[in-house]
A protein has these predicted regions:
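Alpha/beta catalytic cores of nucleotide-metabolism and tRNA/nucleoside-modifying enzymes
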Residues: 1-46, 289-309, 313-383
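Short beta->alpha linker loops
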Residues: 32-33, 110-114, 135, 258, ...
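Alpha/beta enzyme core
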Residues: 83, 97, 122, 138-309, ...
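Short, basic, glycine/proline-bearing loop/turn elements
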Residues: 77-83, 126-132, 225-227
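An N-cap/entry alpha-helix motif that binds or orients negatively charged groups
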Residues: 1-69, 178-236, 372-374, 380
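Short, conserved beta-strand segments within well-ordered enzyme catalytic domains
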Residues: 49, 64-66, 75-79, 105-109, ...
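A gly/proline- and charged-residue-enriched helix-loop-helix capping module
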Residues: 100-122, 126-140
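Glycine-rich active-site/cofactor-binding loop and its immediate structural neighborhood
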Residues: 72-111
Length: 383
């Protein structure tokens, strides 16, 4: 099986599982606690049906939309995800180049494997930076200022990771950053010699954006949970978010909004967008899925800011359902990380090509000429 044989999410997942050591595969694949929310994120789309209109003379549909002040060629972009060099040596560079090739947005994590400046130098495409509020205020300020100098288009502040979720798979596999060989993980790494060779012969693992501020999580092997609990500020509040918005002074989203009340308050403090997200089911297990919440939030604030649905996207039809329910665009992480692990930049390009074709095909079948044609009349909920 190779990249050319990958036609859907499960194909990329299977190929990534064959190529990645078990701790790294399960870091992508897993969620919090019993993984109820992880599974619900995708299953929620099954409770909604698309309603097509026939004989609409669609021709070639326009898939473009605008987010964070930039036009993107399809209403789907890459979510910010950490430590991408664990999946392929090129890491974020591969993702950014693939996103630019398909005219969509690349999103960078604070915990990226390459720096803000390195990505700005290799990509002129739309770029979003994901910010965390650190206990050390100078780290937060430095990240915001560097993004401005590097001409990133927008910032999103992640607000659902005050403490790390209970990711039991990581406990069982002994996942650390950088990877550390233990009795539990030794066999899984030994079974992936190609990955081990690439890891040992390429750029040393580091959290490139913050390496000059702290060595925690860079040259010291520790769990992601430990890093989050040590570095991120669990006392973050609305004033902290407003401070970041004012310091950035540009397109800004809160990532992790799940209630109408919080969406309204995001407007009050100056957000231009929100990302409806539960961190891919990796934080609070038992919480609602983004798709379950998007209609209520859109009905309340959809005319005042951009709404990004983040989580559970596996198919082009999921994107159409989210847009019809009121989202401006969607983002996905797990799917593209599997494609990155399965085939590097070419893997991500294959995934984006698949998704673009699915969205286009389904737009034609729905009788929709442009994204704005996808409204509440195009879906019916089963319950």
């Amino acid at each position: 099986m190779n990249i050319k044989d990958c036609y859907n999410f499960e194909d990329f997942r299977k190929l990534a599982k064959k190529k990645l050591p078990s701790p790294i595969f399960h870091y992508i694949d897993g969620g919090a606690d019993d993984e109820v929310t992880l599974n619900r994120n995708t299953n929620a789309f099954n409770d909604c049906d698309l309603v097509p209109n026939i004989l609409a003379s669609v021709g070639e549909p326009d898939l473009s939309t605008t987010v964070f002040g930039r036009k993107i060629d399809m209403p789907l972009f890459l979510s910010p995800t950490a430590m991408q060099s664990l999946y392929t040596p090129e890491g974020d560079k591969a993702s950014a180049r693939a996103a630019e090739k398909f005219g969509t947005m690349y999103s960078m994590s604070t915990m990226a494997s390459f720096s803000i400046e390195e990505i700005a130098n290799i990509s002129s495409g739309p770029k979003l930076f994901q910010l965390y509020v650190h206990k050390d205020q100078s780290i937060t300020d430095d990240l915001i200022d560097r993004c401005r100098r590097a001409n990133f288009d927008g910032l999103c502040l992640t607000v659902d990771t005050l403490v790390a979720g209970n990711r039991e798979r990581d406990h069982r596999t002994g996942f650390t950053t950088p990877p550390k060989l233990t009795l539990e993980s030794l066999l899984s790494f030994a079974m992936r010699p190609e990955w081990v060779f690439k890891y040992l012969t390429n750029k040393k693992f580091e959290l490139a954006n913050i390496k000059h501020k702290t060595d925690k999580g860079t040259n010291i092997a520790k769990s992601v949970i430990d890093y989050i609990n040590e570095q991120y500020d669990p006392k973050m509040n609305w004033k902290d978010a407003e401070y970041c918005i004012k310091r950035w002074n540009g397109p800004f989203a809160l990532k992790g909004v799940m209630s109408v009340e919080d969406a309204k308050r995001a407007i009050d403090i100056g957000c231009t967008a929100i990302m409806i997200s539960n961190h891919g089911g990796r934080q609070l297990d038992g919480s609602r899925s983004p798709f379950d919440q998007v209609k209520a939030i859109s009905d309340a604030v959809g005319d005042k800011l951009e709404i990004i649905l983040d989580g559970g996207i596996r198919r082009g039809s999921h994107v159409l359902k989210a847009l019809a329910a009121g989202a401006t665009a969607c983002s996905f992480g797990k799917a593209f990380l599997f494609s990155l692990g399965a085939g590097g930049q070419k893997g991500v390009e294959r995934l984006l090509d698949n998704m673009q074709k699915e969205i286009r095909r389904n737009m034609i079948l729905m009788g929709c000429k442009k994204i704005e044609d996808l409204d509440a009349s195009k879906i019916i909920y089963r319950n």
